[in-house]
């Protein structure tokens, strides 16, 4: 199982200096990838988790870090398709793949925030079918010399989009979502599946099995798919025995990583943005960076 690390994008520690520090340190330590996530806004009463109160844009962050790294892959988990144009996203991500010399992974999801749906003018009606068409348009723009699409939701006249991404036929698409239909969609359409912050990690093997079975039914090779897990790590030594996976001492977290690999996860990225003691506006930014350094060193793949 490959290990990645989420860069600071949420809360007080999400500064340019800390982003570069974490990205470079992760690359030096042998981590496979760096990750971000998307959150456009938060409700005025701030009723959500503090992780979502102040979040940097994911693609802009990855473009910034592409200039400060050379080897690690750069991923977003996830961009929410209902809020985006597949044509604009195709251009943005093709450019980012070029700037990063072919290191981009594109995670896509449907979103869950009513506030974001309303603010962006998006509709939840038939959003699953719209997502499938979104992926079709995105792939066509990335890989075809001339693409044309006439569907229920998107109309693309005979069109060229250049320059193309470095990765051929296109950057990997990882679809998110926990609902059965989302898992089946990933098996039919995507290059892999990425779990969200609310995923039941104890049951992740069943989700992976659903994706694989659907891929096989569609005539695809399940063994070629990637299964990426967002590891919302919280280092809490001396915690309760009935702890959540990836919450506990570093030794316990290492054991959890092994169990997730056995469950079929092919890549996990450690995400401290979802620790309220780190990824919140009220957290001490320097203390958060120091804690991240400790986790980076302790879980480094080379050890």
Report the location of each language-model feature.
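Hydrophobic faces of well-ordered beta-strands that scaffold small-molecule active sites
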Residues: 3-7, 34-36, 74-77, 104-108, ...
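Active-site beta-loop-alpha junctions enriched in small/polar residues
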Residues: 8-10, 39-41, 79-81, 109-115, ...
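N-terminal beta1-alpha1-beta2 module of alpha/beta enzyme domains
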Residues: 1-68, 169-171, 273, 278-298
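Internal, glycine-rich beta/alpha segment that forms the wall or movable "lid"
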Residues: 18, 42-49, 63, 76, ...
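Active-site mouth loops of central-metabolism enzymes
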Residues: 5-16, 79-87, 167-178, 237-251
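Short, acidic/polar
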Residues: 14-26, 88-92, 175-185, 246-260
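An alpha-helical appendage that flanks or caps ligand/catalytic pockets
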Residues: 27-28, 32, 125-166, 196-303
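Glycine-enriched alpha-helix->loop->beta-strand junction motifs that scaffold or abut catalytic
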Residues: 68-71, 100, 187-193, 264-266
């Amino acid at each position: 199982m490959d290990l990645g690390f989420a860069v600071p994008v949420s809360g007080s520690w999400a500064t340019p200096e800390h982003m570069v520090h974490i990205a470079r340190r992760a690359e030096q330590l042998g981590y496979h990838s760096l990750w971000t996530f998307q959150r456009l806004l938060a409700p005025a009463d701030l009723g959500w988790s503090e992780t979502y109160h102040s979040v940097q844009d994911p693609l802009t962050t990855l473009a910034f870090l592409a200039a400060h790294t050379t080897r690690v892959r750069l991923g977003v988990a996830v961009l929410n398709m209902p809020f985006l144009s597949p044509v604009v996203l195709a251009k943005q991500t093709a450019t980012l793949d070029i700037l990063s010399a072919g290191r981009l992974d594109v995670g896509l999801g449907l979103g869950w925030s009513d506030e974001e749906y309303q603010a962006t003018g998006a509709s939840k009606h038939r959003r699953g079918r719209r997502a499938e068409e979104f992926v079709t348009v995105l792939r066509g723009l990335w890989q075809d010399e001339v693409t044309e699409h006439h569907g229920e939701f998107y109309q693309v006249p005979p069109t060229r989009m250049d320059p193309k991404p470095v990765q051929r036929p296109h950057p990997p698409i990882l679809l998110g979502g926990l609902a059965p239909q989302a898992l089946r969609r990933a098996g039919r359409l995507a290059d892999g599946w990425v779990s969200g912050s609310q995923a039941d990690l104890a049951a992740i093997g069943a989700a992976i099995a659903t994706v694989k079975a659907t891929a096989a039914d569609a005539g695809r090779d399940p063994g070629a798919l990637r299964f990426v897990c967002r590891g919302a790590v919280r280092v809490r030594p001396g915690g309760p025995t009935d702890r959540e996976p990836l919450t506990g001492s570093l030794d316990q977290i290492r054991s959890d990583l092994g169990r997730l690999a056995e469950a079929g996860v092919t890549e996990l990225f450690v995400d401290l943005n979802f620790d309220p003691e780190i990824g919140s506006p009220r957290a001490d930014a320097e203390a958060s960076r120091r804690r991240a350094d400790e986790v980076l060193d302790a879980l480094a793949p080379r050890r």
